[in-house]
Amino acid sequence: MQQQAIVVDAGDPSTFKEPPKSCALTCPVSGCAENGAPYVCPALAAWDSLPHESTCADWDGGAPAVEATKCTATAASGDAVKYAGPDPDDATKVILPDGRRVTPAGSISYFREMDLEGGEAYSLLPVPSSNWILVVDAGYGVHAVLAVDRTKIGTSSDPVASYVKYPAPKTLNSAAVLVGTSTVLVASDDGVVEALDFDATKGTLTEDDAKSIPLPESVDDNNNKANWYVSGLALSPDGSKLVVTSVFDKRLLVLDATQAGWGKQLGSATLPNAPTQQAAFDPNDATGHFVYVTEQGDRKLLEVDVSNAAAPAVTRSWGTDKNPWGIAFLDARWIAVANDFGDTLTLVDRTANSATAVPVDSAVTLHGEEPTALAFDAPSHMLWTTLAGANAVAAWTVDTSQTPPALSPAGRLPTPWWPTGVAVLPDGSVAISNMRGPSSGTDPTQYPIGSGNPDRGPMFGGMQIVAKPSAADLSAGAAAVATNDQVGALAGAPTVTCPHGENDFPLPPTNTQGPSKHIDHVFFIVRENKTFDALLGDFKGANGAPSLTMKASTVDMDKLWLDFRKAGRQFAISDNYYTSAEVSVQGHVWTVFGRSFDFDERAWFLTGYGGRQVYDNPASQPQGIIPTGRPAEGSVFDWMAANHVEYDVYSEGLGLISAPMVNGHNPVHLDVPGGPTQGQIGYPDVERACYEAAHVRVFCDVGNFVYALLPNDHTEGVGMSTPSPEAMVAVNDDATGIFLDAVSHSPIWKSSLVVITEDDPADGGDHVENHRTPVLFVSPWVKHGYVSKQHVDVSSVHKIFAHVFGIPYPNEIVANAALPLDLFTSTPDYTPFTHEPRQWPLSCGVEPSVNLAEGALSASWGDVDDVDEQPGLGDQVWRAMRGLPATAVTPTMQRQMDESARLVRGRVHVNHVK
């Protein structure tokens, strides 16, 4: 097969709209001409030989004269250059991948049970008159319910007395209630309310299938038949009724909770919309006349009359802010609701039938703190909420004698990474659960997403107990939280000095002084799934581990990643850059939104990861797509449009739901090769890059901000009909070089910045921290041959965007991020990047008969375009790159194949309906 010859007319730009077709990723490769001669992109021809639209500037191929430097930036030092992990100067402090510090108040224990890999503590339920706290542990790996002894939190003893496991595809949700003294009911996606027996004398949990309550057939996110996915559970004050709400179903169920009628459906009500989050009875009303439900679809708190269980009905509703979450009853009149994406509390007056919004922090106007769970302590008149995005819990003193109640900020307490639940115990101490624990540490080989092994990529949550905090504790805690989150203010952050008075620095030190005088085009290129050490671990001047590069030798690394590594040596990189994602669905949230959010952290593994296919829409992931999965400030595309920055999107699934035009410029390219979304991992990136090159050099119609995906380096593993990992990486690298060559040989090169990174670190190990990933800065205005040591992350890249264009920050996470000023220089070097065509030969994977083990693993996967839903792919790519294929199916590979089987069944709903 020859590369398709597209006839181009040197006088007709329209002939460049469709790039030549590539056969590089077609199997078998024997008939592909590109196996001997690399792909040729016509848009890379000499500028004066190309036709140009009238939008193109006159250009002679040269560069402006270089003027002497007027401003300089200092190199980062001190706290600003510390790598993720334990702080070497403070044993009580952990540095997260995003640069924030974790300094938990009180006592902390993390749940490191080895057979609960990938756990995330979703919620907590104190057991009355005891020291026990029950925890729902969900996440990527095995789900579980844990019995935790609060007296052992922070000690050398394991606080987990017992637990019950729910392996995939069983799926738990956060809601849990205690019926009587010994029956625990837990929300699930299994078509039942899961039941357990709890012995408070020993702390023993046992599964009790006989008491699990079957639920009626329901629907999934596509409105197909599916198990009921429970969101809210509420037990009436007299213990006679159980209310159940759903993530996808609009019905509210009232079930019999008495021994005589256990589990019988008494009635149902149709709610205005779904999803719901929490259901709760008012403890101030012993009659249990009403149950209250946070309904996120319409942003409401619902009041449902369940006094007649056979005919429950919605009686009232009150408007809230976006994504109402937790509920707390202040007294018989007032209810508080936490609004996650709204960053507000809603105070509901049931007497006056009104609602009042209160900001979580009146001094902050940006989104990102994310109040979720609520707890009200009546004796102290204190209201508490988890601030998931700030790694904190906040407290207010409440005066209900005023209308509305006066909420006076009492302070905050720092927590570990991503708090999820809060409760005030009878002695006034505060219990807090968290999902992401202390970060994940190093990985000497391959990063396994859900490993519970503390030596290999741990991902686990935990529990925190803070003795009854004083006013001074809360004040000090608020100061600590502010310090922990202000990454950009760390000691040793770079600064810009202009000794001659005139500020000509290309990256303005603030975003309020107008746009950059030198950079007006930014290109953000997102590739797939590599750690820093995997691609750059052998780079001179970088903190790398050569033993962890994907290929064993520098010669092979330079040949396979020819253009990326060439650009890394010519321009600037950082060896202290991170994404806080584990997999692609999170990674694209970070690249598109500049932050993560509670919906993302709780839902990413429900889209196929770990064998759970709860969100089953094959066209999209819920994060960044569905209304309840999009933060209030919107995506980077909404941000650019709101600030009148013309932009283009060359393939991305997230954030495109709105993607408004700017000045009539249509940002979405439906005709981009491989499609406008994230799909078609196996479509040759060289076509994508050549298409984009034509828009840069022939049509000259790119916006000031360009977002583009080049996903081939994700690879499709080792299969008999798929390209080898090396072939896909080589084609991806070729495309990277084509793109850089196009930009740097164009009139806009003199004012351009290209940022290239990976969406997540799923392939390869890293000796510093699992989330460390490569980032490359290409521009005349960056220091050439430079390795930055400043700790930065994806939100830092978005902060660069804000400063280049002189626009407001999109959210608080970006506002607080580090700004890598040291990467830039006032003395430009206009030397362009010259693409070197691919040298690595094309090849396809192995026949299963050649390697039964690797063939069996890859054959177990479903659609490889369902990104990252191939258990074991990262491990397999590592083995293939290192020439160490498995000779037999290992226990780990068998678990991965079993997980794949569950995923494939889930896609056709076999495991969705009982």
Which residues does each predicted region cover?
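Intrinsically disordered, low-complexity proline-rich regions
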Residues: E18-P19, S635
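Predominantly soluble domains enriched in secretory-pathway, periplasmic, or organellar proteins
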Residues: P19-C23, C27-G31, G36-L507
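Ser/Thr/Gly/Pro-rich low-complexity, disordered linker/stalk segments of secreted
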Residues: V8-E18
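N-terminal pro-sequences and low-complexity stem/linker regions of secreted or lumenal proteins
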Residues: S475-K914
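Acidic side chains
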Residues: D9, D149, D238, D256, ...
